[in-house]
């Protein structure tokens, strides 16, 4: 029986045959299913290239600028004398060395305000997660270590460095690594209450000006970050010495028994540490670096 009544019998037959006809047509034309021409069209190629390039650039950018470095031995040779490390000071161990927690990208990358990018404050949470830094170009008086007596003005240098850097964000231009799992670096800090405020300060230079350290002297050489910086440091030391500031107070007094941090180390048998060469970074013409 035809339905609807006014339809012709031929139309009804066509409707009955439509599903089977469609299947047979699909079977007879497999090329329509595996048609690759769509993948060669510009409207497909251009978005694919843009998306792939964007992913690769993002991965490279993250690896180069946003990947956190946990400790000094993990620093790649590509950083030495070429790049700097930004981080927050977590502790000050001596008058010329301290530890920072690497915060790549700083606040712009979310450090300090995103919940998952907080600098740990508990000591156990910082274990194996900080970079040990030795200030370049200076030698501060030694605190009491391993049964050795404390050198005069060692406590003053340590107290000043702690108050100047503790919990502050600093930028360290990495020069070399040493055998104590540290990096020798020129360190810079900006402070709101300095004059002028937020001016970039060279920490080594500030210590020399105040007579809290001497220019680093060693038989195998020292690291200053270039000849220009060495001249600047030596001039700052000369002025502090002339004005008898800090550890230079008794320098000219006869019978005071004054000795420099280097002379103290030599007397205590604390030889120069061996440097660890990493990569092919060129030095400053002063020999290998081994600051202690």
Swiss-Prot record:
This is Probable endonuclease lcl3. InterPro entries: SNase_OB-fold_sf, Staphylococal_nuclease_OB-fold. It is found in: Mitochondrion; Membrane. Residues 281-292 have a biased composition (Gly residues). The keyword Hydrolase applies. Residues 1-27, 257-292 are annotated as: Disordered. Residues 83-250 form the TNase-like domain. It comes from Penicillium rubens (strain ATCC 28089 / DSM 1075 / NRRL 1951 / Wisconsin 54-1255) (Penicillium chrysogenum). Its EC number is 3.1.-.-. Pfam families: SNase (PF00565). The gene is lcl3. Belongs to the LCL3 family. SUPFAM superfamilies: Staphylococcal nuclease. It is a single-pass membrane protein. Residues 17-27 have a biased composition (Polar residues). Ca(2+) binds at residue 139. Keywords: Calcium, Endonuclease, Hydrolase, Membrane, Metal-binding, Mitochondrion, Nuclease, Transmembrane, Transmembrane helix. GO terms for molecular function: endonuclease activity; metal ion binding. The chain crosses the membrane at residues 45-61. The keyword Zinc-finger does not apply. GO terms for cellular component: membrane; mitochondrion. SMART domains: SNc. The active site is at residues 134, 142, 182.
């Amino acid at each position: 029986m035809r339905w609807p009544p006014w339809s012709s019998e031929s139309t009804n037959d066509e409707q009955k045959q439509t599903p089977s006809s469609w299947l047979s047509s699909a079977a007879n034309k497999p090329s329509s299913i595996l048609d690759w021409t769509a993948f060669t069209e510009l409207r497909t190629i251009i978005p694919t290239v843009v998306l792939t390039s964007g992913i690769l650039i993002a991965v490279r950018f993250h690896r180069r600028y946003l990947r956190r470095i946990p400790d000094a031995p993990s620093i790649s040779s590509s950083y030495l004398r070429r790049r700097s490390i930004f981080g927050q000071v977590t502790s000050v161990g001596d008058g010329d060395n301290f530890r920072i927690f690497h915060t790549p990208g700083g606040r712009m990358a979310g450090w300090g305000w995103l919940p998952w990018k907080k600098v740990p404050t508990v000591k156990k949470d910082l274990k194996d997660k900080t970079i040990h830094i030795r200030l370049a170009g200076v030698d501060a008086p030694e605190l009491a270590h391993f049964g050795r007596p404390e050198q005069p003005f060692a406590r003053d240098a340590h107290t000043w460095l702690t108050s100047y850097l503790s919990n502050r964000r600093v930028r360290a231009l990495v020069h070399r690594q040493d055998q104590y799992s540290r990096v020798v670096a020129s360190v810079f800090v900006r402070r709101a209450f300095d004059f002028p405020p937020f001016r970039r300060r060279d920490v080594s230079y500030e210590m020399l000006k105040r007579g809290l350290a001497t220019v680093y002297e060693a038989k195998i050489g020292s690291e200053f970050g270039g000849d220009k910086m060495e001249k600047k440091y030596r001039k700052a030391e000369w002025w502090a010495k002339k004005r008898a500031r800090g550890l230079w107070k008794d320098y000219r007094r006869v019978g005071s028994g004054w000795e420099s941090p280097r002379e103290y180390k030599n007397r205590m048998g604390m030889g120069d540490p061996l440097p660890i060469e990493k990569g092919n970074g060129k030095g400053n013409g002063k020999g290998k670096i081994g600051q202690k």
